[in-house]
Amino acid sequence: MKRSSQIGLTLVVVIVAAAGYAASKYTTWTQAVGSEANWCIEIPPSGNARDYLAQHHPEIAAVIDWRGWSIYPGKYCEIGEQPAHAIARRIATGQREEITLPVPSKRSVAEIAKALAPRIWADSASIAAALGTDNMKWQIAPNTYRIYWESSADQLAERLRAESQAWWTAERIKRAWALGLSQREVVTLASIVQEETANAAEAPTVAGLYLNRLKKKMLLQADPTLKYALGDWSIQRLLDEDKKVDSPYNTYRNPGLPPGPIRIPELAYVEAVLNADQHNYLYMCAKPDGSGTHAFARTYNQHVRNARAYQNMLNRERIYR
C-alpha cells in the first residue's frame, strides 16, 4: 500500500513537472518577440542557420528545434510584436521578403558592387567578380529591382543581365540597327553622352552630334574618353599633351567608338541615343556661363569661337588643369 502511494506520488510529480515544462514552452512560444512596430531578421544562407538563430533569437530557435522544422535563409520583416511560434513558422515555410534594390549608374563595376553590397547578403568583392570586368558594363541596366536579400552574387549578376536583355525589346534593337550600331555600341555611346552632359534635355542633341561624326568617319574627339583613358575624372582642363595618351579609349587618336562603355549609363541616356535628334551639328563646347550646357556648331570656325570663349573663362577662373 505504501509502495503504491509512493508510485502515485512520483507520477504526480512527473506530471506536474511535465505540465510546468509544457507551460513554460507555451509561454515562450506565445510570448511576443520584439517591441518595435517593424523589425527584421536576416538569416544568412551560409554557415549554420540554427546556430545563428540560437545566438541571436533563442526563443525562435527553440520553437524550430522543438518542431523539427527546416530553416529558410532570407530577410523576414514586418514582424512587430508577433509570438515566437508565428515567426518560427514564417521562417520554416520560407515566407521571406523581397527587398528593393536600386542599381545606380556608376563609372565602374567595382562602384556598382560597392553600392549594392550593403543592401544584400553578398559582399562587394563577390558581386564585382560575378558581374565581370568593366567590358561587361553594357550588360547592366540601372533601375530599381525587387530581389531576395539572400541572393548570391552569381544570382544577382544573372538577374541584372536578364533585366538588361529584357529591356532591349525588339523595337529598341531595331532602332539600334537603324543607326548602324549594336546594342553594346549604343550603350557605349550613351556612356559618353552622359559623361558629356548632365543636362538630360540636351542629351539627344549630343547623341545626334556624335552620330553625325560617326557617319562622316570623323574622330569623335570626346573629352570624357580622354579622362577615362588617363584614369582621372577630376581634370577640368584637358591639354594637347593629354590627347597623345596611348589608349584604345582615346577618341582623339582612334576612329569610331571606344571598345566599351566608359561608365554604366542611365537608361534615359541609352534612350537618348536611340532617339537622337537629327541635325547638322558636328562640334560642341561647354558654355562659359556655368550652366552645364553646350554651344553647338555646324562649322569648325564657329566651334573655334565657342571654344575660345570657354577657354577665356577658364583663364579668368585660373583653371589650368
Model-inferred region functions:
Residues 221-263:
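Conserved SxxK-family serine transpeptidase/carboxypeptidase catalytic domain
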Residues 2-228, 247, 265-268, 272-280, ...:
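Conserved catalytic or metal-liganding residues and their short signature motifs at active sites
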Residues 284:
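Active-site-proximal loop/helix segment associated with metal-binding centers of metalloenzymes
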